[in-house]
């Protein structure tokens, strides 16, 4: 079942018209119609839609678990008590020269265990996932890898990897390395420096970098 089908099923479960559901979540009827027809591939209103329809946000966003949030989940099925749904964006984090994102939209999401998030000292409400694009961060991050980042962690720390907004509006994933002089290198892990040269930032100017968040996990396929 796709997102459009789950939204329609949730609305019917709540016995609401498109107009009634739209009014409850602060959208217009056309927006609900576009979602149910698949014309809109994602929405940042998942939590509001789920609440208005009385269904599980985890189910509505990603199809995990039971539709009815009050219904006991099947053994082994993800539950909202144990798992957090982290919003996924259509924007791709460029591991290269910067991928221009003129619009960022939440679409479905990925789930992570709450106890693991607690161990890494991150709160679900501060987290987002994007997909890496390009090879400048190889071998640490490969093209197509999922990247989880924490928007509450924006202070530069030596050898950490960050999602950074570029001056042209693009988003890049880079590692920050502090030098003995106090200056910082904004660098790619790819050793080909002719293709991916390092950038310098002074000790004072590094704090002016538009850091969106620190990468706390990445994952992808094998081979």
From Swiss-Prot:
CDD domains: HTH_XRE, S24_LexA-like. It holds the Pfam family HTH_3. SMART domains: HTH_XRE (SM00530). PANTHER family: FELS-1 PROPHAGE TRANSCRIPTIONAL REGULATOR, PTHR40661. It comes from the Viruses. It comes from Pseudomonas phage D3. Keywords: DNA-binding, Repressor, Transcription, Transcription regulation. Residues 7-60 form the HTH cro/C1-type domain. PROSITE patterns: HTH_CROC1. Residues 18-37 bind DNA. InterPro entries: Cro/C1-type_HTH (IPR001387), Lambda_DNA-bd_dom_sf (IPR010982), LexA-like (IPR039418), LexA/Signal_pep-like_sf (IPR036286), Peptidase_S24_S26A/B/C (IPR015927). One of its GO terms (molecular function) is DNA binding. Signal peptide: none annotated. This is Repressor protein CI.
């Amino acid at each position: 079942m796709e997102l459009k089908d789950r939204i329609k099923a949730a609305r019917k479960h709540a016995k609401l018209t498109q107009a009634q559901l739209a009014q409850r979540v602060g959208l217009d009827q056309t927006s609900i119609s576009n979602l149910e027809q698949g014309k809109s591939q994602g929405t940042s209103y998942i939590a509001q839609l789920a609440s208005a329809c009385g269904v599980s946000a985890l189910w509505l966003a990603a199809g995990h678990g039971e539709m009815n949030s009050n219904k006991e989940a099947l053994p082994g099925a993800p539950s909202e008590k144990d798992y957090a749904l982290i919003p996924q964006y259509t924007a791709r984090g460029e591991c290269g020269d910067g991928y221009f994102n003129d619009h960022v939209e939440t679409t479905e999401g990925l789930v992570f265990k709450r106890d693991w998030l607690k161990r890494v000292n991150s709160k679900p409400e501060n987290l987002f996932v994007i997909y890496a694009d390009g090879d400048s961060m190889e071998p640490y991050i490969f093209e197509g890898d999922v990247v989880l980042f924490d928007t509450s962690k924006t202070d530069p720390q030596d050898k950490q990897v960050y999602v950074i907004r570029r001056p042209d509006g693009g988003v890049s994933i880079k590692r920050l390395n502090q030098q003995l002089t106090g200056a910082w290198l904004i660098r790619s892990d790819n050793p080909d420096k002719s293709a991916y040269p390092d950038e310098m930032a002074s000790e004072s100017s590094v704090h002016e970098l538009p850091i969106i968040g620190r990468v706390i996990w990445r994952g992808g396929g094998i081979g």
